[in-house]
Every structure is written in C-alpha cells, then in structure tokens.
Amino acid sequence: HFDNLAPKREAWIKKSKGFYSEDIKYMQELIPNGSSILEIGCGNGNLIGSLNPISGVGIDISAEMIIEAKKQYENINFTVADIEDTNCIKNLDQTFDFIIISDTIGYLNDIENTFDNLHKVCNADTRIIVAYYSPFWEPILNIAARFKFKMPELPKALLNETDISSLLDSAGYETVKYQKKIIFPFTLFGVGRFLNRFLSCVPILSYMCIRSYVVSRSLKSASLDTPKSASVIIPCRNEKGNIRNALERLP
C-alpha cells in the first residue's frame, strides 16, 4: 500500500497544504533547530526534513517511501525497518533529543511494547512527540479520502490523547504536555492560519481540532541520570541553643 503511494506522496502533501503546513509549524514550535531527531514512520521525509536536525534518522517500513526521502534530504539518515522489530532499535547506537511518531501509532500491533523499546534511545532530556488524528474527524476524513481530497489510508486504531497518554504511562513515560491543534485544515489566503492560531486554543472549540499532540519523557532514563540525594530532618521546638550543636554533630 505505502510503496504504491510513495511516488504520489509529495503531490498529496501539496494538495493538503493547509493541514501539513500547520502541522510543521507546530512541530517547529516544539522542536528547536539543530536538535537530534528520530522519526518513526517518516514516509518521504517531509516532516523531519522541515525541522533542520543536526542529526536526523528516519525509519519507515516502506522501501519506496525511503527512496523518495533520500532523493529530497541527503543530510538525514533514512532506513527501511519495522519499528516493532526489536533489532531496529538495537541498531541505533545513540540517544535523541526528540522522537516523533506522527500518524504511525494507529498502525502498530503492540503500541505499548514499541514505546517500551524506545527507552533505549532516550536520555533524561528526550521528548517523545506523538501526533495523531482525532477520532471525531475519522468519518469526515474517510469521506475526503473516498472523493480523493485526501490520501487513502489503511484501517488503523482510533485513539484520542487520553488513550495515547495512558499507553505511554503504562510503558514508563510521563506526559508533560498535550495539545489539540488545527481546527481549519485549509490556507484560504491566510484565514486558515488565523483561525488555527487563535480558535484552537478556545477550550470548547479545541474539541473540534483535527490533531492532538502528546509530549512525554522517559521516566526510566530520567531516573538513571538523576543524582541521588537525601534529606536530614531534625524536629526542633524552643531549642535555639541546641540547633548549632545538632548541625555540627551531623556526619
């Protein structure tokens, strides 16, 4: 399926320019230039290539998608691999500042196990960003795909940001931020940018957004890198003359 779509992937992105440009803008807010980035399910490299990584690795199960990615972004290391294969992560000999899982999570057979394997490429400061469609929009997106307004996709799991956060929590991650974005997936001469910037932040209207972003960190990596500390508590009351002696006797 994805191999067949690879030659037309860039055309689909241009056709849905409003959506993809907003997605990239928000990712750029989350990820500073010059970061080390791993993208899982990178497709033709459009997203990771737009983030200017100092060190970038893109993984995709589709060989044809990787061929297209290598044509466009020579400075990024693209690899054909199945992220659910444990050897895929073992072959990565570095940790990353950011790990992006954009629209890929719904195709995984064992989401929690995949998250668990990713601890190996996390350090205390690594942030995992999971971006996914809102289930609310699924019927609309299916209709759009049927009438060729959107790239066709295989059936996938429907997950909201609470589901994703729970799966991350079960795998040993802590959610540090989540946000809904993109309420209007069209440019419309700049109107789309205005609506997405201001209306998607309104609490009630945010539930109508197409996109959710869940940002988390590895608790396993954080606990390994955090220096151990101890507290010594001395309960005192009306013992002004003894406090100095108590402190001096501490080892």
Regions found by a protein language model. Give the residues of each.
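A conserved beta-strand element that flanks and buttresses the S-adenosyl-L-methionine
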Residues: 100
